[in-house]
C-alpha cells in the first residue's frame, strides 16, 4: 500500500527534502504532497482573477485559490507532518494542523524544544512530536513497514 504524506509548514529550510530523501533511501512506499512552497507564486495565486491594490483582498483571493490545493491534499493524505520553525510564525501550519485534527488524520509535529509551550495544544492533538527530519523518516519507516 502506498502512503500519502502531506508536508505542511515552514518553507525556509530544506526539511521537506531531507524527509523525502530519507524515505527514498529506505525505499519507503510513500507519495509526498505539499502546499505551494514558492512564496511569491503562492502570494500571487489569485492575481489572474482580479487586480487588487488592497493587500487584504489580494491575500484573500490568493488564499482561497491556494486552499483548493491544500484542502484536497489534506483530505487525501494518510498522515501529515507539520513543521514549525522558530524564526517565523507559521499561521498556515497551525491551520493545517487544525484541519488534520478535525478530519481525524494522524499527524506528527516537527519543531525544536524551544517552542513546546506555544504549541502545547497542537502537540496534544498530534500522534507524535519530532525534533529532526530524520526522526520523521524513522516514524514513517515504522508505520509503513509493519
Task: Pin down the residues of each PLM region.
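Conserved catalytic or regulatory cores that recognize and/or transform ribose-phosphate-containing ligands
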Residues: 1-146
